[in-house]
């Protein structure tokens, strides 16, 4: 286990309701200190609710995406400047579901990360391979390509303000989880790629694991030297499970 602080981020995806969110957020807020720092990334309509309910607490909140554009005729887009106006702390960029269903490219993800940073928002940059790519032995090739697009677009100073999340696509929402050793190997590889830019930044950078993290496997994953927490999907919708992961 590393000395880096742990971070556990809940990605609610396309889930939530005003009443349900209020109950979930209040339970998380009332739980007190956990081993890991906690954050929740909610759908855009609920960000103001997160801001209100979590005000004054140690729980951070963020968005699940951010536009690569800054302003203009881009219907449906939400700019980083808009998010930052009311205190958004994080923005997920490059999630595999955005890459797969919305055709986002590595270059677009890099621009989104830059837009977030320009407005004081920490981008959570997601990388990960499909099952076919893993079975073809292309895991490192794929995640390196995805990460390098971001590394090449940012200064060393900016790199010190991002979070990376490794999310093997074959383990998202499938119930399958990479073994702790498989995940650690990719995390170590990713940290090595960052170290090629700056060793100090690499040593400090949080690299999260995302892929069917649950209370019963979080502790083992989080003991790995280069796994600094988790990007949590389904388990983040239940306060008890999310908090258990935060305490792992």
UniProtKB/Swiss-Prot annotation:
GO-annotated cellular components: cytosol
The UniProt keywords, alphabetically, are: Cytoplasm, Gluconeogenesis, Glycolysis, Isomerase
Per the Swiss-Prot or TrEMBL record, the active site comprises 95 (electrophile), 167 (proton acceptor)
This protein's pathway reads:
Carbohydrate biosynthesis; gluconeogenesis; Carbohydrate degradation; glycolysis; D-glyceraldehyde 3-phosphate from glycerone phosphate: step 1/1
Q: GO:BP terms for this protein?
A: gluconeogenesis; glyceraldehyde-3-phosphate biosynthetic process; glycerol catabolic process; glycolytic process
Instruction: Report if keyword DNA-binding is assigned.
Output: no
Signal peptide interval: none
Localization terms from the record: Cytoplasm
One of the entry's Gene Ontology molecular-function terms is: triose-phosphate isomerase activity
Q: Under which EC number(s) is this enzyme classified?
A: 5.3.1.1
The record, for NCBIfam families, names: tim
Return the similarity comment.
Belongs to the triosephosphate isomerase family.
Record HAMAP family: TIM_B (MF_00147_B)
Quaternary structure annotation from Swiss-Prot or TrEMBL: Homodimer.
Annotated protein name in UniProt? Triosephosphate isomerase
């Amino acid at each position: 286990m590393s000395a880096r602080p742990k971070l556990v981020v809940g990605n609610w995806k396309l889930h939530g309701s005003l009443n349900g969110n209020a109950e979930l957020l209040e339970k998380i807020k009332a739980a007190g200190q956990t081993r890991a720092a906690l954050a929740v990334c909610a759908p855009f309509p609920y960000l103001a609710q997160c801001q209100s309910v979590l005000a004054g607490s140690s729980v951070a909140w963020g968005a699940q995406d951010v536009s690569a554009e800054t302003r203009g005729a881009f219907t449906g887009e939400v700019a980083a400047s808009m998010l930052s106006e009311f205190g958004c702390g994080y923005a997920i960029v490059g999630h595999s579901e955005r890459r797969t269903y919305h055709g986002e490219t590595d270059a677009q993800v890099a621009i989104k990360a830059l837009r977030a940073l320009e407005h004081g928002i920490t981008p959570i940059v997601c990388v990960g391979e499909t099952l076919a790519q893993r079975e073809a032995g292309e895991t490192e090739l794929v995640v390196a390509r995805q990460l390098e697009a971001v590394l090449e677009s940012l200064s060393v100073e900016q790199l010190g303000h991002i979070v990376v999340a490794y999310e093997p696509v074959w383990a998202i929402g499938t119930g399958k989880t990479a073994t702790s050793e498989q995940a650690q190997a990719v995390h170590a590889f990713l940290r090595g790629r960052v170290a090629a830019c700056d060793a100090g930044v690499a040593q400090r950078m949080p690299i999260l694991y995302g892929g069917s993290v649950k209370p019963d496997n979080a502790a083992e994953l989080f003991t790995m030297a280069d796994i600094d927490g988790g990007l949590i999907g389904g388990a983040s919708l239940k306060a008890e499970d999310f908090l258990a992961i935060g305490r792992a």
